[in-house]
Every structure is written in C-alpha cells, then in structure tokens.
Amino acid sequence: MKKSTKKESTHSKEESQTQAGNSEARKSGPSTKKAGEKTAEPEKATAGSGTEKSPEAACREENELLKDQLFRLAADFDNFKKRTARQMEENRKAVLEQVLLDFVEVTDNFERALKSAQTAEDMGSIVSGIEQLSKQFFSILQKYGLERIKCEKAGEFDPHRHEAVQHIETSEVPDNTIVDVYKPGYSLNEKVIRPALVSVARNPDETEK
C-alpha cells in the first residue's frame, strides 16, 4: 500500500514539472531560430536619412547658384565698363587741356608780336618774330606726334605720301619726278593724315612725237 502511494507522488511531481515547462515555453513564445543561426539585427538607419536631396533638387540648387554667380559677374563687368569709359573721358579731357594750354602760349606770343609790329621800324625784326612763332607752333605739333612729310622738288613721287594734282609733260626730268610742291603733307604717328599736294613730270610718249 505504501509503494502505490510513493509511485503516485512521483508521477504527480513529473506532471507538475512538465506543466511548468510548458508554461515557460508559452511565455517565451515559439522559437524559429535554427542551430548556429544568428539573430537578425534591426537595420541601421541610413546616414542622413530624411535629408538626402533628389538629383532634380540638387540640379535646381546648383542652377540657382550658377545664375547668381552669372548675375554678379555681369554686374561687375558693367561697372568695369563704366569705370573704363569714365577714365577714358578723363584722359581725353586731360590731353585736350594740355594741347590747348600749349597753343595758348603761341597765342600769347602772337599778341606780343602784333603789338611790337605796330611800333617797329625794322621789318626784319617782325619777320624774325614770325619765324620764331612758326617754329614754336610746329614744335607743339611735333610734341603730339605730327610730322611733315618729306617732299622736295626734283624728288621722286610716292603715291602713298603724295597726291598729284597736276601732270606736266616734260622730257627735262625723269618720269614721276616732283616738279613743284603746292601744299606740304603731314603724318601723325607714322600715319599719313594729309598727303602732300604736288605736280608731277610725265615724259611725252615717243609715239606721239
């Protein structure tokens, strides 16, 4: 009788342990992880998640930046042109002012010469004064790059520096020889601004004789 009671007690104890194990299993939930398999970790948030720009937005932003730079460059260039124009105008006025001041000196000398001529008894002094004024005047022209073109009688005619206003038929001098100079020519910084006006010899055609 005692043995039966002991067996029942042991059986009851095993059932209690089994129920306790089942209860623990229910709490922890079914496990699907296989042996040797690592538990999957939650995906890490991508750096800058939510702030990354789309290609279209990046292009628009870059376009706006380039447009702003272009507008700034255009404004700077416009200001540069205005400054350059002002500087050129100031330089032009300064040069013109200096030229006029130089010729004012000649005007002063002309006035003094006229006063002296009214009381002068010697015409030679008047002529000498006029010659000095002519030299002073031309020296001012030379100061600004003006030169008289070389042109002499019996010299050779140069169509680039001389203008023939008359042809004189003669056999006394070679063809295209300058016979007379009517008006001197001038060049400014080696550029002809007025050719010398001359008459040129032209030898008669032998067939016309």
Swiss-Prot record:
One of its GO terms (molecular function) is protein-folding chaperone binding. SUPFAM superfamilies: Coiled-coil domain of nucleotide exchange factor GrpE, Head domain of nucleotide exchange factor GrpE. Coiled coil: none annotated. Residues 1-16, 34-44 have a biased composition (Basic and acidic residues). One of its GO terms (biological process) is protein folding. It is found in: Cytoplasm. GO terms for cellular component: cytoplasm. Pfam families: GrpE. Keywords: Chaperone, Cytoplasm, Stress response. Residues 1-61 are annotated as: Disordered. InterPro entries: GrpE, GrpE_coiled_coil, GrpE_head. The keyword Cytoplasm applies. Participates actively in the response to hyperosmotic and heat shock by preventing the aggregation of stress-denatured proteins, in association with DnaK and GrpE. It is the nucleotide exchange factor for DnaK and may function as a thermosensor. Unfolded proteins bind initially to DnaJ; upon interaction with the DnaJ-bound protein, DnaK hydrolyzes its bound ATP, resulting in the formation of a stable complex. GrpE releases ADP from DnaK; ATP binding to DnaK triggers the release of the substrate protein, thus completing the reaction cycle. Homodimer. Belongs to the GrpE family. This is Protein GrpE. It comes from Methanosarcina acetivorans (strain ATCC 35395 / DSM 2834 / JCM 12185 / C2A). The gene is grpE.
